[in-house]
Swiss-Prot record:
One Pfam family this sequence matches: Fer4_7
Disulfide bonds: none
GO molecular function: 4 iron, 4 sulfur cluster binding; metal ion binding; NADH dehydrogenase (ubiquinone) activity
GO-annotated cellular components: mitochondrial inner membrane; mitochondrion; respiratory chain complex I
Keyword Phosphoprotein annotated: no
Record GO biological process: aerobic respiration; mitochondrial electron transport, NADH to ubiquinone; mitochondrial respiratory chain complex I assembly; proton motive force-driven mitochondrial ATP synthesis
Entry's EC annotation: 7.1.1.2
Protein name in UniProt: NADH dehydrogenase [ubiquinone] iron-sulfur protein 8, mitochondrial
Family statement drawn from the similarity comment of this UniProt entry: Belongs to the complex I 23 kDa subunit family.
Membrane topology summary: Peripheral membrane protein
């Protein structure tokens, strides 16, 4: 809101004449404009105060959050680490962990697989290929047992379907390779895995026996 002060009108007229406003309309307009005063200063001051308060609150909040974050960081320096020093340290694995595949043998050394092909039939990724032939005693044994590990989804269906616990997913999870061909497992590779991890595989099957 602006208000015209009559006491300042002569001074404003003189100032307008000095600045070159000689015509009457321009002289009167300049003089009137020079005599306006903004009298509603409380609203302007309140806006300035509100802005200052907002800036101060934001500044205080920023420093508060910064100090709180630094305090939390320092508190974790004196706690036990939540991570392990892998690969020199390894965490526990569940007996149901599904890792690298393996073919097992009986304690006598005879391979367990009876070439029923249930694992091949149930595999949703069609990663298993089996060929078999009968023996002289009438039993069937595999002549070919291949698993394409690049197709395998580690669902565990092959292990669940096997009636003699021949094909299993062992505890090994460190079997990365440099070539694609190394992930095409044949029967010899699978039997070697079974011989290597037999103790752990047998213990896991025994631990999970009551829940199957």
């Amino acid at each position: 809101m602006y208000r015209l002060s009559s006491s300042m009108l002569p001074r404003a007229l003189a100032q307008a004449m000095r600045t070159g406003h000689l015509n009457g309309q321009s002289l009167h307009s300049s003089a009137v404009a020079a005599t306006y005063k903004y009298v509603n200063k409380k609203e302007q001051e309140s806006e300035v105060d509100m802005k200052s308060a907002t800036d101060n609150a934001a500044r205080i909040l920023m420093w508060t959050e910064l100090i709180r974050g630094l305090g939390m960081t320092l508190s974790y320096l004196f706690r036990e680490p939540a991570t392990i020093n892998y690969p020199f340290e390894k965490g526990p694995l569940s007996p149901r962990f599904r890792g690298e595949h393996a073919l097992r043998r009986y304690p006598s050394g005879e391979e367990r697989c009876i070439a029923c092909k249930l694992c091949e039939a149930i595999c949703p990724a069609q990663a298993i290929t089996i060929e078999a032939e009968p023996r002289a005693d009438g039993s069937r044994r595999t002549t070919r047992y291949d698993i394409d590990m690049t197709k395998c989804i580690y669902c565990g269906f092959c292990q669940e379907a096997c009636p003699v616990d021949a094909i299993v997913e062992g505890p090994n999870f460190e079997f990365s390779t440099e070539t694609h061909e190394e992930l095409l497992y044949n029967k010899e590779k699978l039997l070697n895995n079974g011989d290597k991890w037999e103790a752990e595989i047998a213990a896991n099957i025994q631990a999970d026996y009551l829940y199957r």
